[in-house]
From Swiss-Prot:
NCBIfam families: PRK02101.1-1, PRK02101.1-3. This is UPF0246 protein plu0566. It comes from the Bacteria. InterPro entries: YaaA. Belongs to the UPF0246 family. GO terms for biological process: response to hydroperoxide. The lineage of its organism: Bacteria, Pseudomonadati, Pseudomonadota, Gammaproteobacteria, Enterobacterales. GO terms for cellular component: cytosol.
Amino acid sequence: MLITISPAKTLDYESPLATEEYSQPELLDQSKRLIRICRELTPAQIASLMGISDKLAGLNAARFGEWHADFTPLNARQAILAFKGDVYTGMQAESFSNKDFDFAQNHLRILSGLYGVLRPLDLMQPYRLEMGIKLENKRGKDLYAFWGDLITEKLNEALEQQGDNVLVNLASDEYFKSVNTKKLAGKIIKPVFLDEKNGKYKIISFYAKKARGLMSQFIIQNQLTQIDRLVEFNLDGYAFDESLSKGNELVFKRPEQH
C-alpha cells in the first residue's frame, strides 16, 4: 500500500528532529532546472505568479537564491518533519518511532512542485512552489508539463518495491493531477472525509486536510497493507460510511464538532 499526500506551505526548520535518519531526493537534477528558472524571476514576478505578498515574495526569492543541491542535515531537513500544514498536524510525524519512520519511508510519498516526489526522510531545503502555478518552462506552460510522467514513474517504482498495486490517494486534486493515472500501475483508493455542519455532511477543507494526515498516521502506525483494514479508521471521531462509499471512494463521516 502506497500513500500519496500533498506538501504544505508552512515549514518548520527549528523544532528538534525526531530522527537522524535521512535520504536524498531522487529527482534533484530536475529540481535544479526549476531553480534556474525561478532565479530569473523578480520578487514582483514571484508575488504575481504565486498570489502572495511582497514580503513573502522576497523571502521566496531569497530561498531560490540560497538553494543548492548539496543537501546535508546542517542545511536541509527531512521532508516529513519540515512540512507543517494541516495534513502534517494530523499526522504528527514528530511522535513517530523508528519503526514508523521505516514503514513511512517505504509506503508514503509527498508530491512536490519543486522536488517531484519526496520520500519522508528525503532532505529538502525550504521552498514554495505550488504544483498548480503557471511557471513556463521548456516542456510547457506549467509544472504539470514540466514533470510529465516522471512523478508517475517514481510512484510505479515505489509500488513495485513495496509489493502490491494499491495507492491510497490522500493528496489534493491540485497535486494528484501531476500523476498520469492511465500509466499508474496501481489501483487508486480515495478516502473522503465528511464533517457535519448545521445538520448536513460536507467536505470542510481544514478538517479534511487534518483527516488526511490522521489517515496517513493510522496506516503507518498500524503498518497496514490490506485495503479492507482502511475501513477501521476511527481517529478523532470519524467512522466509515458504507452506504456513501462507492467504487474507489471510501467515505468517512464525523458528527459536528463542538
